[in-house]
Amino acid sequence: MFYPDPFDVIIIGGGHAGTEAAMAAARMGQQTLLLTHNIDTLGQMSCNPAIGGIGKGHLVKEVDALGGLMAKAIDQAGIQFRILNASKGPAVRATRAQADRVLYRQAVRTALENQPNLMIFQQAVEDLIVENDRVVGAVTQMGLKFRAKAVVLTVGTFLDGKIHIGLDNYSGGRAGDPPSIPLSRRLRELPLRVGRLKTGTPPRIDARTIDFSVLAQQHGDNPMPVFSFMGNASQHPQQVPCYITHTNEKTHDVIRSNLDRSPMYAGVIEGVGPRYCPSIEDKVMRFADRNQHQIFLEPEGLTSNEIYPNGISTSLPFDVQMQIVRSMQGMENAKIVRPGYAIEYDFFDPRDLKPTLESKFIQGLFFAGQINGTTGYEEAAAQGLLAGLNAARLSADKEGWAPARSQAYLGVLVDDLCTLGTKEPYRMFTSRAEYRLMLREDNADLRLTEIGRELGLVDDERWARFNEKLENIERERQRLKSTWVTPSAEAAAEVNAHLTAPLSREASGEDLLRRPEMTYEKLTTLTPFAPALTDEQAAEQVEIQVKYEGYIARQQDEIEKQLRNENTLLPATLDYRQVSGLSNEVIAKLNDHKPASIGQASRISGVTPAAISILLVWLKKQGMLRRSA
């Protein structure tokens, strides 16, 4: 039977991509249906209990700038917040938070259940209704049919999912959940390229069986960072530390002696695993010279005894997992409460998608998340938001939208996927972006919130806060530009006390702030330049904009030059191991593909813009810079 009411947009799957897609479409006023096999697992963290990190935190901030859910949810659920790369420049600083799984799931579900225009329905989807190469609905397990103008697939690892523990395997979407086999078969009937990928997760440990007294603690930052531009630290729950242990030679011996029982090394798994989140058996074999690997013991929540040992993802048999865990300091008597496992699943070649994440072959069908070959909650959320907003626009007969690489990490992500595709689970890094000095966490709202407002994603409260911030930045910059101090002025002595070299000429507040030893906080304690802004986000923006103004302008010039390097020739006989500064991944891919030009090299999956810059510098130094006519 058909459900009596039609919808504008149907979302299939309630993970990180699906929840953002559903929220985006509903925020834009479209009647949206979220279909999930289990309402209780909406927003479930299937693997690590954390949000953010290098590159990933940037995506979370961008999702938030467009009115998304993830940043708000983690602000309510984060039990340890840190800024990574805090001592480095603002382009690569990244926020990361440990999460209480239960609180995170509750925050997501509460937001979904209180979102106007959104209906949630619990039933697994087994089929799509496709008419004349256009999707017009979905069919659930019990044969109930829903009609819609657009459908978004956000099915994670569920498509023909197979779980491996040692040489044993069984069908599953993730531990404790069934796979989606009928839907997988149906999608394989469509004109889409399909492959298999693999990911894994570590065993979970009972905290009561760990001796934390012998382990180093890792605390969060104080003051506590905040993820959402609308958030504040008072929303955070109780904060707790993580702990650090290490693998050792005993651990590595256990792994080496049991590789014949690993499904990866025995050839049982055909899917390709994530390069940047390898299993512990992969790490031991790939880095044979390392006698230890750092393992972070991360709490899964304030009311749970489960510990997530970040760094020992494995699909080895359970008895071997026990030996691995108990070989490490502090874990000699540890008990496993959930075994680690690998899961392989279907993904669809993202080169078959438009930049809007709509299929090139089936009109109205959108793909987001791990089905596109990515790995990570943040990558999934960003794609979900983009697919959801474009499904909403399509259902309203409007043109699709996708950010450019120069606008957002989301633009980089989508361009990489749709242009280059991927043969391994793709994760975001800052090194993937050419424009990273302009694509910072701190300015995600300045880049995207106005666009989000035009698209219908940003509500009145966020829009008012954003405009107030803009006004504060502009007013403060004008104040600092127009406030001066001279070497002979009474205030000069106070200013000179904070400078490495005393004033030799008249200087404005902005001139002083450009000095490396001067910070905005320090400057605004000085009599001529007080008081400081009470808006901390605006104050941070003023400092970064002033200090990095010249660098940003220079980067824009570099971008224009980069375009001219498209036709720079690469010698056919070049062994890229000669080029210092390239990563092992880039060297392997360049030696394998042997691109004829910089342009070709730049389009090889995994060859980053930073690697292209290194190549250009090397060619120039060698006197080998040649361009085709």
UniProtKB/Swiss-Prot annotation:
It is found in: Cytoplasm. InterPro entries: FAD/NAD-bd_sf, GIDA_C_N, MnmG, MnmG-rel, MnmG-rel_CS, MnmG_C, MnmG_C_subdom, MnmG_C_subdom_sf. Changing G15A: Decrease in FAD binding and partial loss of activity. Loss of activity. FAD binds at G13, G14, G15, H16, A17, G18, V125, S180, Q370. Its cofactor is FAD. GO terms for biological process: regulation of cytoplasmic translational fidelity; response to UV; tRNA methylation; tRNA wobble base 5-methoxycarbonylmethyl-2-thiouridinylation; tRNA wobble uridine modification. It comes from the Bacteria. NAD(+) binds at residues 273-287. One of its GO terms (molecular function) is protein homodimerization activity. Keywords: Cytoplasm, FAD, Flavoprotein, NAD, tRNA processing. One of its GO terms (cellular component) is cytosol. Homodimer. Heterotetramer of two MnmE and two MnmG subunits. NCBIfam families: mnmG_gidA (TIGR00136). Belongs to the MnmG family. NAD-binding protein involved in the addition of a carboxymethylaminomethyl (cmnm) group at the wobble position (U34) of certain tRNAs, forming tRNA-cmnm(5)s(2)U34. This is tRNA uridine 5-carboxymethylaminomethyl modification enzyme MnmG. It comes from Escherichia coli (strain K12).
